Amino acid sequence: MRIYCVVLVLWMSAGASAQAPAPKRDLSGVWALQPAREVSEDDKQSPGGDIPPLTAWGKARYDLQKPGYGKRAAPGGNDPILQCDPMGFPRILYFPTPFEFAQISNRVLQMFERDHVVREIWTDGRALPSDPDPLWYGYSTGKWVDDTTFVIESTGYDDRTWLGATGFPHSETMRLEERYQRVDHDTINFTLTITDPQAYTKPWIALPRVLKLRPRAEIRQGYCVASEEQAFTKRIREPGALNTGKAPKN
């Protein structure tokens, strides 16, 4: 009977912990994007959802892209990350490595394991620049719209980055709206809207995703090493694209 009571108490404690409420206005911690059934193998580094039609400009850019793996894989792939160019945002968010949110007085820092990148999200009330010089990770501002929902708006992204590994393009005038709603202590519901009239005929509403807290995790130094990428491409990726049209991803 005593053993049964102990087990029952532990089970109830675990359940209570899982249902712990979200702290107010706090995203701090290491988070991992959860898998989604709706995401195909080819789309694992993309926003997913219903991809809108490309404009003529967008289609021309898309046709120039040569992915390193997937259905469109071909020898001579020109995915920028194959030579260790920055992955860019939002693609890095969908890469299967965690990231950490840290909050300081006038910014939220989003620190990614991939390339050990730090993204700054300003929370001091400033407006986005109207005509910014493009950057790999753009310019971002954020605000709390209620006690559990943080909204980020951003623009000024370098158009050399791709929206996923299959080569979907974007322009320098792309604007993003991200919503991070912390629904309980361990869970964030994430939504993304991409607005880029130069590349797409209507806004791209990304597939809603879930982020889970990883309380014991630490962000490692996951740098892209050019010599390792080149060796992997020569030994595995290029032969895979040539033989099957589906070069493996590293």
Name every feature range the model reports, one short phrase each.
Residues 1-4:
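Positively charged n-region of N-terminal signal peptides that target proteins for export
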Residues 13-15:
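N-terminal signal peptide c-region/cleavage motif recognized by signal peptidases
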Residues 18-250:
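PEST-like low-complexity, intrinsically disordered acidic/proline/serine-rich tracts
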